[in-house]
């Protein structure tokens, strides 16, 4: 293990421990933020989530793993009403094109996968038992990610982006690209007045599995 990987693994355990052993006096804003988005502490911990300070602010983070299973960095979400993301370490940011958030938690089913925009959309899918899902953390996919999906024998891809203009246009463009790459591709739009899948989850927290299953029917 090289020095960089060793240091990243050390950071992972520090961030994870910070969240696991959080108290009312420290990192409480991060825990309350998760609750406002419909998630409990275990939802975040079991996917390797953690919390730390960056730029004197609390940031939740998720590990970013390369295709060969190595930890290469973190996706950090600022604990704030305004969405703000950072990739760390700053001195050598990880290449998102050669990795996925949630790679270690992926359970491929029926050679199919659901691609969502954001990390919290992905967590919402997991809450409903949709474990063959990954967050793109954006609207595009890299050639390296496409090749990895092919290596994993993925045949069908369901694109589940946000319910805004950017999400709809992004889904359309991605469908065209993935179809040309040989995948069977379907865009699934949110059939409700919710801006994204996490918001839809918040509106239907008590019967989320049934609601999401119905949304994914086509």
Curated annotation (Swiss-Prot):
Transmembrane regions: none
Protein name, UniProt field: Uncharacterized protein MG010
PROSITE patterns associated with the record: TOPRIM
Pfam families named among the record's database cross-references: Toprim_2
Organism: Mycoplasma genitalium (strain ATCC 33530 / DSM 19775 / NCTC 10195 / G37) (Mycoplasmoides genitalium)
Domain Toprim: 111-193
Signal sequence, start to end: none
């Amino acid at each position: 293990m090289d020095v960089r990987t060793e240091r990243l693994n050390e950071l992972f355990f520090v961030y994870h421990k910070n969240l696991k052993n959080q108290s009312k006096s420290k990192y409480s804003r991060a825990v309350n933020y998760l609750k406002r988005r419909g998630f409990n502490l275990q939802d975040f911990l079991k996917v390797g989530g953690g919390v730390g300070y960056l730029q004197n602010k609390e940031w939740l983070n998720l590990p970013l793993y390369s295709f060969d299973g190595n930890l290469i960095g973190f996706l950090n979400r600022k604990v704030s009403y305004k969405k703000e993301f950072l990739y760390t370490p700053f001195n050598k940011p990880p290449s998102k094109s050669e990795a996925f958030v949630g790679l270690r938690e992926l359970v491929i089913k029926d050679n199919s996968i659901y691609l969502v925009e954001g990390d919290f959309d992905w967590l919402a899918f997991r809450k409903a038992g949709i474990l063959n899902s990954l967050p793109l953390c954006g609207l595009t996919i890299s050639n390296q990610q496409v090749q990895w999906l092919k290596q994993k024998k993925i045949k069908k891809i369901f694109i589940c982006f946000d319910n805004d203009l950017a999400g709809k246009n992004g889904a359309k463009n991605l469908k065209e690209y993935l179809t040309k790459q040989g995948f069977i591709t379907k865009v699934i739009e949110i059939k409700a007045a919710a801006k994204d899948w996490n918001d839809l989850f918040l509106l239907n927290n008590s019967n989320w599995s049934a609601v999401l299953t119905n949304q994914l029917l086509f």
